[in-house]
Amino acid sequence: MKKQDSYIYFVGIDCAQNKHDFAVINDQKKFLIKKGHFSNTLQGYEKFLKTVLSKCLNKDKILFGMEVTGIYGTNLYERLASEGYHVVIISPDSVKKYRDYKGLNKTDKIDSTCIAELLLKGDAQLVDIQKKRIY
C-alpha cells in the first residue's frame, strides 16, 4: 500500500474479544493518542469515535486500519464503514514484521501503534473490504 496523501490522520486498531486498543498518528508523525482503548460494545464504540474526532479535526481525512484477528473486529469494521469512514484491514503478519523490525515486544497497545505507523508509511499490503480490492 502506498501512503495516500488525502489522509491526515491514521488510526491503528488492535481488536480483541472484550476491548480494542487504538492509536492515532498524524501525517507529521506525531502521535495524537498513543495508548487508547475501548470496550467492544456500542457504548465503547461511541466513546472511541468521540475521542478520535476530538483529535482529528476533519473526519474525511481519517484512515482507520484494523488487524485481522478472527471475528472480534467485525462489528467495529461494519459500523465505521456504514458511517462512511474509510477502513482497511491489515494482516497480523504485516504487523509482526514491522514490530520485529523495530525490536518491540508483542502487546495490544504496541500493535495498535504499529498499525497506525504502517498506515502512515504505506508499507503494508492491505485489503480494502469496502472496495474489494488489494493495494
What are these regions (language model features)?
Residues 1-135:
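Phosphate- and other anionic-substrate recognition elements at nucleic-acid/protein interfaces
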